[in-house]
Design a protein with these regions (language model features):
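Short S/T/G/P-rich N-terminal loop/turn motif that feeds into the first structured element of a domain
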Residues: 1-161
Length: 161
């Protein structure tokens, strides 16, 4: 796979801001779009439990971790606390935590995403957290509880509407 499409919307409010398309417009859109798709991957669905909006022009790369926390409530509390405690590091970055409720990738129940400037930018962010937020990071790892790391990967945001 070379590209992913991600639709994000408020639960029970998935319509378009401009209003719904007519059926023929929707059919035309997907017909044209499908001409550019060689094969479709699997679809997944879940909920956003925590979200900080960011500038995807400044930080166009997202590092995504697929995880299974033993205690999702404790994980969310620890996640929200580290984002607040290290707000200088996370400023203008998309930072999110959510669930996989349908079609969990490799059994992962949750995901985390952090925006960055590419591979080197993400590594520098981790170094900054370790060097300058040691206590906050230690608290995060203690308070989040046991977490199974399933996989992680980086994606580039090419367009956002």
């Amino acid at each position: 796979r070379t590209h992913r499409l991600v639709w994000i919307w408020e639960l029970n409010n998935g319509g378009r801001v401009e209003g719904d398309m007519q059926e023929f417009e929707n059919d035309a859109f997907w017909g044209q779009f499908s001409n550019h798709v060689e094969s479709w991957g699997t679809a997944k669905a879940g909920r956003i439990m925590s979200w900080q909006e960011g500038d995807v022009k400044e930080f166009p790369w997202g590092h995504i971790w697929d995880i299974s926390p033993k205690d999702p409530v404790a994980f969310k509390k620890a996640h929200d606390k580290i984002v607040k405690s290290a707000s200088d590091v996370f400023k203008n970055r998309v930072v999110g935590f959510g669930t996989y409720d349908i079609n969990r990738p490799n059994g992962a129940s949750h995901w985390v995403v952090i925006g960055g400037t590419g591979l080197n930018g993400h590594l520098n962010m981790h170094q900054d957290l370790e060097d300058n937020y040691t206590k906050a990071m230690n608290d995060y790892f203690i308070n989040r509880g046991e977490v199974e790391h399933v996989q992680d990967f980086i994606v580039e945001v090419l367009a956002r509407y």
